[in-house]
Amino acid sequence: MTVGISVEKGKQDTPPLELHYLGDKVLRQKAKRIAKVDDEIRTLAKEMLQTMYSSQGIGLAAPQVGVNKRLIVIDTDPENPANAPLVLINPEIKKFGQQLCPFEEGCLSIPGVHLDVIRPDEIEVSYRDEQGKPKRIKASGLLSRVIQHEIDHLDGVMFVDRVENEIALSSQLKQRGFALKSVQRIA
């Protein structure tokens, strides 16, 4: 699960990419598969990691920086220099575990909003790494949740679409200046 992309884990004064926020239509588009993993994709992944670290996040999907590609970056332990980030290109969940669990989620595209979302605790995911090699991992706990959250972004879904507590959702969105009409409930 190591990445061949070297990135300093720290906040930059000016992150290389600009985040997009709830209400921006780019976040609701289904991202396109990446046909070829090349230096352009590796550069994008590196800049996404730099932007994620600068924003104090643990995951970021390409649509969140206005890029309509199926690419996500994750680091569930950004304070630990020894923990290598993950780059997942064209990730696809192959299997969901049966145990569902609620957990509070937040999102760099909806700053300040933190609400419980119910998701499977375990998943199995296939993807290509930053060299274009096919990979498959089993993930549980926080890593599983972050992968699911970021893959949702690739499908135009945001975590607030999955929140069941409508009162808390409405309240937090309003407090942070986001419109409830931007939420697209998942049935």
Swiss-Prot record:
<keyword id="KW-0648">Protein biosynthesis</keyword>
<keyword id="KW-0479">Metal-binding</keyword>
<dbReference type="GO" id="GO:0046872">
    <property type="term" value="F:metal ion binding"/>
</dbReference>
<dbReference type="GO" id="GO:0042586">
    <property type="term" value="F:peptide deformylase activity"/>
</dbReference>
<protein>
    <recommendedName>
        <fullName>Peptide deformylase</fullName>
        <ecNumber>3.5.1.88</ecNumber>
    </recommendedName>
</protein>
<keyword id="KW-0408">Iron</keyword>
<feature type="binding site">
    <location>
        <position position="149"/>
    </location>
    <ligand>
        <name>Fe cation</name>
    </ligand>
</feature>
<feature type="binding site">
    <location>
        <position position="107"/>
    </location>
    <ligand>
        <name>Fe cation</name>
    </ligand>
</feature>
<dbReference type="GO" id="GO:0006412">
    <property type="term" value="P:translation"/>
</dbReference>
<dbReference type="GO" id="GO:0043686">
    <property type="term" value="P:co-translational protein modification"/>
</dbReference>
<dbReference type="Pfam" id="PF01327">
    <property type="entry name" value="Pep_deformylase"/>
</dbReference>
<comment type="similarity">
    <text>Belongs to the polypeptide deformylase family.</text>
</comment>
<feature type="active site">
    <location>
        <position position="150"/>
    </location>
</feature>
<dbReference type="InterPro" id="IPR023635">
    <property type="entry name" value="Peptide_deformylase"/>
</dbReference>
<dbReference type="InterPro" id="IPR036821">
    <property type="entry name" value="Peptide_deformylase_sf"/>
</dbReference>
<feature type="binding site">
    <location>
        <position position="153"/>
    </location>
    <ligand>
        <name>Fe cation</name>
    </ligand>
</feature>
<keyword id="KW-0378">Hydrolase</keyword>
<comment type="function">
    <text>Removes the formyl group from the N-terminal Met of newly synthesized proteins. Requires at least a dipeptide for an efficient rate of reaction. N-terminal L-methionine is a prerequisite for activity but the enzyme has broad specificity at other positions.</text>
</comment>
